[in-house]
């Protein structure tokens, strides 16, 4: 379904470095800046993508309570008003200035455990016109997929991780679902910087 070279591209940095990491613990999500009905949509997306990946969710992380934090807002400067966020995100003001200058509409920050696996992810979404065009379900699914692994910055630049069925239902693209399943295979490491990891991933995708 995916060649080794295609798998590599999902995790290859512009520098030529191969960078892969997956979650090393159940995902406990919390969402800020949305109404209650949107909250349930996002949590349903987390559960659906974790189920497709073979990963798990939890109500609470024993160390930090919530380990996937998703923030929705209209302007980057709003994050300066979030209590204690500057303690979680180093050099927050400088980062926000860069994102504002670049007119970015999203940004993700990962934290890792001693094995190199993901232990926390912070997702920031500035709801510009491009993001507003997406319905809530699709936006939630896309963002959860992007938070499931440490992807290349270009991984989804030219194609969404979602596909539309003939009946109008939105689902993960089959190759993305297969890639996530391979990434969360218990025999695979939580982190790798070795391009041969892509070969092992591709082999697991092929046999499914």
Model-derived regions, located:
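Glycine-rich, aromatic-bearing surface loops/beta-hairpins
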Residues: 116, 120-208
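Long, folded non-catalytic interaction modules
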Residues: 37-42, 58-142
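Long alpha-helical, hydrophobic tracts
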Residues: 1-69, 74-78
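Short N-terminal segments
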Residues: 1-5, 90, 207-208
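Glycine-rich loops and low-complexity Gly/Arg-rich segments
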Residues: 52-57, 93-97, 147-151
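Short, Lys/Arg-enriched charge-dense amphipathic segments
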Residues: 42-53, 78-92, 177-189
